Amino acid sequence: MAAPEPLSPAGGAGEEAPEEDEDEAEAEDPERPNAGAGGGRSGGGGSSVSGGGGGGGAGAGGCGGPGGALTRRAVTLRVLLKDALLEPGAGVLSIYYLGKKFLGDLQPDGRIMWQETGQTFNSPSAWATHCKKLVNPAKKSGCGWASVKYKGQKLDKYKATWLRLHQLHTPATAADESPASEGEEEELLMEEEEEDVLAGVSAEDKSRRPLGKSPSEPAHPEATTPGKRVDSKIRVPVRYCMLGSRDLARNPHTLVEVTSFAAINKFQPFNVAVSSNVLFLLDFHSHLTRSEVVGYLGGRWDVNSQMLTVLRAFPCRSRLGDAETAAAIEEEIYQSLFLRGLSLVGWYHSHPHSPALPSLQDIDAQMDYQLRLQGSSNGFQPCLALLCSPYYSGNPGPESKISPFWVMPPPEMLLVEFYKGSPDLVRLQEPWSQEHTYLDKLKISLASRTPKDQSLCHVLEQVCGVLKQGS
């Protein structure tokens, strides 16, 4: 057995992938002269270790008369209603986010009324941001057009349809603009996975799907024409703390430096042993193509010794765009895992011509996979990611660089931060009874459970300090 380097946490987006923060004015109308959307803003950030944010919106030009440039940011719900692509109705809009469902009414003027509270919102992004912040207070933007569904279909599709219908009347520069919102691809993937959870798909069933990339995802930018030597642009890794907020200028393929557990004064949460056969097959697979490769890792998790043993690699022998072949390969791998008595313990992929460091997109995916493998139980189930860089010019020699990484859960998962701003948050200063507030009750209840080696006053001071910071 060959043990890899100690695992390193990497910056990531937690539960959310990069997304767009759209700020649409209620009065926008592409048929009005000189109407246009505002410029971009940065999206949400995350923790200094692993948080990761969303992207900001793109600037948009005006779209007035016949010579005006048509842009996707000029499309609003009111425009889609006016052109009969949408119809107003009760409960026709929905958001699924981290196991929560929100329903909204589409009003004739293009506004959204949230059924639960009766609040109205001027745009999908405003509603999505509000709802997502209730579930995850650290959320900075809502990616409304990718998050909100109209009668089961994402609003992005209706926006794209509207743009296609109007491209015949626009200049070539406008026709070249992508109808899909930039930076939303990861958000779309994440929301599809959330829907699988809502539909009752178990972690075991989900293991049949590739952990690396969606089969329909286009080839990685590193893919090149066969027979040509690669002179790809060097992707310079950045430290997570230097990222700041993630806007549209931040490429999801931006590489992020990993940090050792020792550097952040934390113990490695589990030990890892990897079979040399796994490293051999991963290295071999990565050398065969100039494009990224993806595969599964099978092994066992020993709860008592906190040891994750990776015993076999299962390459996905399909192209990223070949969904039909991918489904058959996934089923074959699933059966192989089952027959060998192995569990799905992780995934691997390659960066052919870049350092063996995770990208923002990789980090987003890894965090989601960690949560998915853990499932609904409280038991800890690790998920390991391996990265191979076979042709990176910065490698010390001909030998490929193989690196493991694991994403440290972001601090917004702390309990106080998690519930902060939620509608069902207990207001500790309010009276619980005639004699006590909710805070008094909490102190009395915790007093009987204070650790023996710590003083009661010290523990309660710490608890109260945390509560004050979260209020």
From Swiss-Prot:
Compositional bias (Gly residues): 36-63
Comp. bias intervals (Acidic residues): 16-29, 182-197
Record domain RAMA: where: 71-166
Enzyme class: hydrolase
Sequence ranges of Low complexity compositional bias: 1-10
Binding of DNA, residues: 123, 125, 145
Positions carrying N-acetylalanine: 2
JAMM motif (motif): residue ranges: 349-362
EC number in record: 3.4.-.-
Residue ranges of every copy of the MPN domain listed in the record: 272-407
Keywords (A to Z) from UniProt: Acetylation, Hydrolase, Metal-binding, Metalloprotease, Phosphoprotein, Protease, Zinc
GO biological process, one term: proteolysis
Statement: the UniProt record of this protein carries the keyword Protein biosynthesis: no
Reported modifications of this chain: Degraded following binding to N(6)-methyladenosine methylated DNA (m6A).
Region (Disordered): 1-63, 170-229
SUBUNIT field: Monomer. Mainly monomoric, but when binds to dsDNA, forms homotetramer assembled into two homodimers. May interact with histones; this interaction is facilitated by dsDNA binding.
Family that this chain belongs to: Belongs to the peptidase M67 family.
Domain topic, free-text comment: The RAMA domain recognizes and binds N(6)-methyladenosine methylation on DNA (m6A). The RAMA domain mediates interaction with histones. The two acidic regions inhibit DNA binding. The two acidic regions promotes histone interaction.
Annotated function: Probable protease. Acts as a sensor of N(6)-methyladenosine methylation on DNA (m6A): recognizes and binds m6A DNA, leading to its degradation. Binds only double strand DNA (dsDNA) in a sequence-independent manner.
Listed PANTHER family: EUKARYOTIC TRANSLATION INITIATION FACTOR 3 -RELATED
Protein name per Swiss-Prot or TrEMBL: MPN domain-containing protein
Species per Swiss-Prot/TrEMBL record: Homo sapiens (Human)
Lineage: Eukaryota, Metazoa, Chordata, Craniata, Vertebrata
Gene: MPND
